[in-house]
Amino acid sequence: MKRTILVMALVFLFAGCLLFIQPQDGFCADPIIVGVPTSLYTPFGSYGLKAVNLAVEEINAKGGVNVGGQKRPMKVVVSDTRGGEPGVPVHDALMAYEKLLTEQKPHAIVIGAFRSEVLIAAMDLVAKYKVPQLGTIAQTPGFQAQFRKDPVKYKYLFRATTDALIDAGYIAHTLDMLKKDFGLDKILHIYQDTAWAKGFAGMLQKHCKETGWTEVGYEAYADGASDFSPALSKAKEGKAQVIGMVWDVPLGAGVFAKQYVAMKVPALLVGFIPPMGSPIAPKAVGPDVEYSMTVEFPVGATLALAKLPKTGEFLDKFKKKYGELPEPPAVNSSAYDSVFVLASAIERAGSLDPDKLVEALEKTDYAGVSGRIKFNQDHIMVFGEKSADETGVCVVFQWQKDKDGVLKRVPVYPEFLAEGKIMLPPWMKK
């Protein structure tokens, strides 16, 4: 009996080796360890991890990654940093980050920190351990500012997604359309008191002042906030026509969405509030999501675009594997793309040596779900608003009812991706 079990075990072991066999010695190839230190409390982290696992599964199904003539599988290792949970100190998140680096010894990192404050603090850790990182969540422009202080030290760090200034730029240009086409010119800003949201809201405020908007309010709330009624009341009393909102913590965003609906605030909601932009928003929030506008960064995070087939292909595969679409309208496609960018760099480097891998990553030119992926001198992905063949791109969509009365997300900006025009609610029409 024992001999039978031993023989069967050897058979299964041999079968598992066949795909990743090293031609010169006949042994199973060691896996490429891909580390994911992020906050799994947030949907950005949990759905991003699903996207990474999907990409790794696809790559391994095709034989793995060619490393200097050897086909090697990818293996994902995860550390929940809890960095996105309100009240969790940056230090605690860093300890989880470092534990993954020292114990799991990844060859590279994808996704990375959720909270921008954790990203900035973790840059020194990544540099210390010389592990190439493709960050795909944290949005603070402080990343490139820190990078410029010592490009040699921080050369292992890359941002393979947008930052707050890119996101805000798309919303700013949407506000320009609202002002030009409908004469709207009164706005109240609400933002989460965190690094990335400050950058987003600050740019939006500056743009509005420069383009003639009247500011009804500029309201900051702690990331653990659970009552937004003072700001919403201010919007009503000040007759704001638009609320520019930026938030990412699940609890607060959900509370805001419900209070906005319950208080019947007569202002158009524009910005980034995940529950309002999620594919399941009509069920989770209700029919009052109609007319709200969200920037999805980058494209392909949750919404399939008719003019960018790769977005639909990724989301179809995601839904087939997990039985649902990703929920947060941001960065899921970046997480997916990052694995392929990493695999391509490894193959071009012909090595897992971190310095050679950095050189290969710097030369990245990859056509991904999120658009064309190239990095600039600050190791951040280049974005634009004109063509996914030239740069990474985002999209602004609005919830509208189709001819059957069903709420759909309609791309309205940029023009080359638009599938409809912005619609004002009846109570705003003059």
List PLM regions with ranges.
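Short, low-complexity disordered leader/linker segments with a strong preference
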Residues: M1-I33, L101-T102, K128, W427-K430
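Signal peptide-proximal N-terminal region
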Residues: A29-I32, A51-V78, T211-G212
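Extracytoplasmic "Venus flytrap"
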Residues: G35-N53, S79-P86, V90, R115, ...
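Stable alpha-helical elements in mature extracytoplasmic
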Residues: F44, G48-A55, P89-Y97, V118-A122, ...
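Beta-alpha junction/loop-to-helix N-cap segments that form part of ligand/metal-binding clefts
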Residues: F44-K50, V65-R148, A160, Y221-F228, ...
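Extracytoplasmic ligand/sensor domains, especially the bilobed periplasmic-binding protein
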Residues: P106-Y218, L268-T294
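Extracellular/periplasmic periplasmic-binding protein-like sensory domains
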Residues: A164, A257-Y336, E347, R409-E419, ...
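Segments of small-molecule ligand-sensing domains
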Residues: F318-N332, A343-V410
